[in-house]
């Protein structure tokens, strides 16, 4: 939701899953409100027909998840990059800023999807929703990225589009920029009180930011020893030792 709009493909996979289970398809806008908390929660919400999903049978949910994952793996043709994303990532890379992608999307889809969108090369680290046990709003992912990059919360910025992103950033002591587009279950991102709210990532580039905020990507420009990082969600969930064993390094 921060970098790409993958809802059309997610909705198509949800509908195929529901069809296999003999259920009516979901509305695209309903799926847009359901995404953001990982594939398991999305499937349970689709089966429940709403945000609340506690009553969904666990066996049915597992069956639905398998069908959904199979369907989603087959096509990402409807996914698009949001305006301003490539310009911003390109600028950051030129400044030597190290970037990480932290998403609740299943890990197996993350790198191939970003490479298909031609933005995977910008990220040194990629963390999927099943890489570690903890998902956002747990701050573990942010803390681990900062440890790997050798930076402090004051040197970092987290950019996201949801309540989970804002809560994770606050828990990690990192300033958070909230985007007005993306997936926040129909709630305005202003309600989550991030450090700054913008409509387009390019608003953070030099000369575009609001001086009153005191936050710019220029402030995070890397020093000669590259001690800066920007963690970009859309979406560190596993024990640290397992994470180290499976870590996705990007040259």
Swiss-Prot record:
Q: Which PANTHER family match?
A: PHOSPHOGLYCOLATE PHOSPHATASE (PTHR43434:SF1)
Which Gene Ontology molecular-function terms are recorded? Answer: metal ion binding; phosphoglycolate phosphatase activity
UniProt name for this protein: Probable phosphoglycolate phosphatase
Indicate which residues the UniProt annotation says bind Mg(2+). Answer: 161
The answer to whether the entry has keyword Magnesium is yes
**Record GO cellular component, one term:** cytosol
Database matches in Gene3D superfamilies: HAD superfamily/HAD-like, Putative phosphatase, domain 2
Q: Specify whether Metal-binding is a keyword of the entry.
A: yes
Q: Name the coenzymes or cofactors required.
A: Mg(2+)
- Coiled coil feature spans: none
Which InterPro entries does the record associate with it? HAD-like_hydrolase_sf, HAD-like_sf, HAD-SF_hydro_IA, HAD_2, HAD_sf, PGP-like_dom2, PGPase_prok
Q: Which reaction does it catalyse?
A: 2-phosphoglycolate + H2O = glycolate + phosphate
Q: What class of enzyme is it?
A: hydrolase
Q: What does this protein do?
A: Specifically catalyzes the dephosphorylation of 2-phosphoglycolate. Is involved in the dissimilation of the intracellular 2-phosphoglycolate formed during the DNA repair of 3'-phosphoglycolate ends, a major class of DNA lesions induced by oxidative stress.
GO annotation terms (biological process): carbohydrate metabolic process; DNA repair; glycolate biosynthetic process
Record-stated family = Belongs to the HAD-like hydrolase superfamily. CbbY/CbbZ/Gph/YieH family.
UniProt keywords (A-Z) are:
Carbohydrate metabolism, Hydrolase, Magnesium, Metal-binding
What EC number is given for this enzyme? Answer: 3.1.3.18
* Pathway participation: Organic acid metabolism; glycolate biosynthesis; glycolate from 2-phosphoglycolate: step 1/1
